[in-house]
């Protein structure tokens, strides 16, 4: 994922909050993070047993927009108040992709990271992060329950981080150019030739899961039950679908501003998006777009603050995890960045009182339609044993797909 901070425009963009279908089935919303029997062992890393005084410093790896200190906008600053309250000086390093974040955490120079689900299991099983003692993070108690103990942020019922914010990957289309209104991801897969050269897709190996989700609904013979748990045959089918899609794709995007530009210029008329992108395009009034969750359901992301296994400043990191999930600050981050806050009390603190409705912040049913990004591992996430393909294999295949 490659994202940058934005000022939100939800009041102007309510029209984009279109659910394309009430269907979508179960996404595994009740699945916990417990590994299957005979699954890989998690490296033993002790969790903090008690909270002490801050060490005076905190070194973070984070997505742009997650540690704002007033530099980008003097009215947007939750870092300096944190420093004043705790005595922990924040030094943050922007990670542009999940792969870059994993590499930075391997350096041992950082106390914590705001990891997306396509990085979390790599960090956990790599022994790079520690389990979190949630009793030491008071604001965790009121984090949305549907974000706790999930496959991307916990193992064996043990949380390995504190949920920060989340969002769905939506299907967006120009409703002046695309007719009839699509209700299925088939519009960018089997029927994509109708919009040849105008289709856009997310540029990451994790996008293979979007193809797998589509096949899960339309090719039951493949027996896909989790789009992040693909054996070789299932992966080959997803790769074949994406290679067929490739000839119709005009642009792959990872920087959200590029997709905004593509839809506004007319270079793209249909493809995967985030709510914030739909909001921006709608607000700019350069293209008429609608976006929502198709009938198959969708993938999405939920970011997690994780503490390094060998954090030099663990007390400051725990203080940060509690601070960033406090109601007022979590609301600030969500509105600045353009995502649903994890904190259930944050919706009372947003400046735009329609914000949480637009982002479905408290909507468990909406969340349950989402297969959140989870790192593919050889040990199948659906419990089939060691027959699945891992993230490294997906990365190789993604390179081949793009050609």
In which residue ranges do the predicted regions lie?
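Bacterial signal peptide processing site
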Residues: 24-27
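Extracytoplasmic ligand-binding site segments that recognize negatively charged/polar headgroups
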Residues: 59-74, 109, 114-264
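Mature extracytoplasmic/periplasmic domains
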Residues: 303, 307-374
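Conserved C-terminal helix/tail region of periplasmic/extracytoplasmic solute-binding proteins
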Residues: 369-403
């Amino acid at each position: 994922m490659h994202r940058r901070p934005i000022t939100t425009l939800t009041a102007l963009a309510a029209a984009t909050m279109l659910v394309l279908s009430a269907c979508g089935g179960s996404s595994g919303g009740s699945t916990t993070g417990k590994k299957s029997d005979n699954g890989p062992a998690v490296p033993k890393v002790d969790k903090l047993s008690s909270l002490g005084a801050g060490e005076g410093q905190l070194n973070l790896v984070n997505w742009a927009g997650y540690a704002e200190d007033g530099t980008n906008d003097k009215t947007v600053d939750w870092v300096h108040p944190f420093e004043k309250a705790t005595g922990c000086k924040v030094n943050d390093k922007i990670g542009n992709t999940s792969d870059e974040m994993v590499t930075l955490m391997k350096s041992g120079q950082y106390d914590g990271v705001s990891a997306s689900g396509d990085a979390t299991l790599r960090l956990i099983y790599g022994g790079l992060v520690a389990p979190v003692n949630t009793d030491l993070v008071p604001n965790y108690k009121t984090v949305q329950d549907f974000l706790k103990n999930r496959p991307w942020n916990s193992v064996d019922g043990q949380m390995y981080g504190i949920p920060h914010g989340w969002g769905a990957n939506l299907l967006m289309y120009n409703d002046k150019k695309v007719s009839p209104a699509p209700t299925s991801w088939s519009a960018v897969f089997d029927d994509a030739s109708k919009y040849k050269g105008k289709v856009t897709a997310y540029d990451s190996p994790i996008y293979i899961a979007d193809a797998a989700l589509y096949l899960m609904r339309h090719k039951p013979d493949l027996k896909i039950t989790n789009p992040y748990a693909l054996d070789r045959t299932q992966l080959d089918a997803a790769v074949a679908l994406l290679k067929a899609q490739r000839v119709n794709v005009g642009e792959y995007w990872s920087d959200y501003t590029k997709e905004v530009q593509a839809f506004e210029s007319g270079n793209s008329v249909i493809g995967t998006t985030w709510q914030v992108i739909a909001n921006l395009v709608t607000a700019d009034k350069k293209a008429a777009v609608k976006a929502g969750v198709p009938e198959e359901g969708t993938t999405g992301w939920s970011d997690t603050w994780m503490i390094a296994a060998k954090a030099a400043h663990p007390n400051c990191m725990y203080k940060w995890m509690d601070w960033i999930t406090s109601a007022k600050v979590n609301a600030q981050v969500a509105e600045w960045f353009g995502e649903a806050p994890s904190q259930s009390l944050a919706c009372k603190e947003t400046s735009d009182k329609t914000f949480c409705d637009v982002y479905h912040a408290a909507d468990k049913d909406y969340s349950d339609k989402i297969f959140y990004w989870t790192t593919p591992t050889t040990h199948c996430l659906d419990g089939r044993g060691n027959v699945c393909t891992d993230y490294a294999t997906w990365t190789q295949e993604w390179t081949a797909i793009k050609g």
